[in-house]
Amino acid sequence: MLYLFSYSDLNHSLFILLALFFVLCYEAINGFHDTANAVSTLIYTRATSAHFAVIMSGLFNFLGVLLGGLTVAYAIVHLLPNDLLLNSNSKNALAMVFSMLLAAILWNLSTWYFCLPASSSHSLIGAIIGIGLTNAIITDSSLLHALNVPKMTNVFLSLIFSPIVGLIISGSLIFLLRFFLKKKKNHYRIHMTPLEREQKEGKKKPPFLIKIALILSSIGVSYAHGANDGQKGIGLLMLVLIGIAPCGFLVNLNASKKEIIYTKNTIDHLYEYYSKNKVKIIKNTKNQKKIDFSIKNYNYFEIIKNIKKTKFLLQNIYDFNQLNIKQRFKLRHFLLFLSENIDQTIHFSNIVKKEKDFLKKSKKDILKTIEYAPMWIILIIALSLSVGTMIGWKRIVVTIGEKIGKKRMTYAQAMSAQITASLSIGIASYTGIPVSTTHILSSSVAGAMLSDGDGIQISTIKNIALAWILTLPVSILLSGFFYWITLLFIKNF
């Protein structure tokens, strides 16, 4: 980590330090902004004290980041077009980084101040889109290319549909609990609010088994949040470092000799595959282009040329430190290009399952060179997220716990909301899909209460929906405006 500050230009080192500070601030805000969702149900059902719930949530957020992998992280990195990320000069890269971070932080703090559980994920993704769009307008390039449409479509679909899925699943769980437990003795207890239990039975705490279920489901939400949102923080920091300190982060400089040889072997196998299937792929390309606009730039001969260039670049290389900065840029570009081509090849109609499995594995293997994160990055993101969880959580907790439904949550509603959220976010993290913890859990709470017939507070739902609708466009406009102003300032000075 210390080599980041070894630049001869003191200003550059200071800017890197400031960028790191901004990213960690964003992640800490994410902690107390989003993780409040995980502790709100515990606190308002009196399953644990507020302090215990927050500390426990912070701990499992930390573990979620450490053990969650990197699939979501690089879904965030790839939202920014590669040419913008790799071709920016240092001043433009700094403008891009600070505009993006400032926009996301300002919106997150604003919604937190007004007690609105808005999505940190939406604000980050919106800020990245704003940079890409503004750059396209300034450089008079394609807006479609600036949006990286295939990646953007997948992210948008996940962010839009995940709350709907949360509402439906949570409501269904309430229905199932009522159906299967109606003949059990004391089944009514799970459908009581803490206040009702205190008034009827004189006890403040939930029954033991219900308490354990609430704690475990809350742990699940915290861990899943760390795995998904923590990965976004890792992706954001890698995006920043690739932009302003590319020499050390374009490729994994810590890759072992064995790993590099494995990458080279994978490239060789891909060359053999494409050479062997030349006629089939060229024929299928012509047919596929008639029905699939996304592969209009697919060219078999360009793929072969790219593979040959990669093979040549890696000749006699057993340590990526042997590559100079230009060669590292080229290697990253070649591997990303090849990865996109593999994705397109997989969707050809005459590619059999065995070939698809080979191509998917090959893509995963070559991306290990560029889709990585040093352990110190994972650790500081985990620490920032967990520390953020332990401060500033009260404002959002009040909204989730008291203002969504017309009455306080029952134990069953809390459990169904948390189980839904932990499963949904966990699956999304495993599959590399960035989702919003805030929207999944708040919609799960609403779904549980609607299923129970308790009703919801329309005014609060309107405010949450308004924050949901505004987050993307506002963060897009903010980051785009900041980027434009910063570039003007750089140009004039």
UniProtKB/Swiss-Prot annotation:
- Localization terms from the record: Cell membrane
> Which reaction is catalysed here?
phosphate(in) + H(+)(in) = phosphate(out) + H(+)(out)
Which Gene Ontology cellular component terms are annotated? Answer: plasma membrane
The cross-references to InterPro entries, in alphabetical order and at most eight, read: Phos_transporter (IPR001204)
Q: Name one GO biological process term.
A: phosphate ion transmembrane transport
Keywords of the record: Cell membrane, Membrane, Phosphate transport, Symport, Transmembrane, Transmembrane helix, Transport
**Chief subcellular site?**
membrane
Question: Membrane-crossing residues?
Answer: 13-33, 52-72, 94-114, 124-144, 155-175, 207-227, 233-253, 373-393, 421-441, 470-490
* Molecular functions (GO terms): phosphate transmembrane transporter activity; symporter activity
Q: What membrane topology does the UniProt entry give? A: Multi-pass membrane protein
This chain's function reads:
Low-affinity inorganic phosphate transporter.
Q: Which family does it belong to?
A: Belongs to the inorganic phosphate transporter (PiT) (TC 2.A.20) family. Pit subfamily.
**Protein name, please?**
Low-affinity inorganic phosphate transporter
Q: Which organism is it from?
A: Buchnera aphidicola subsp. Schizaphis graminum (strain Sg)
Q: Which gene encodes it?
A: pit
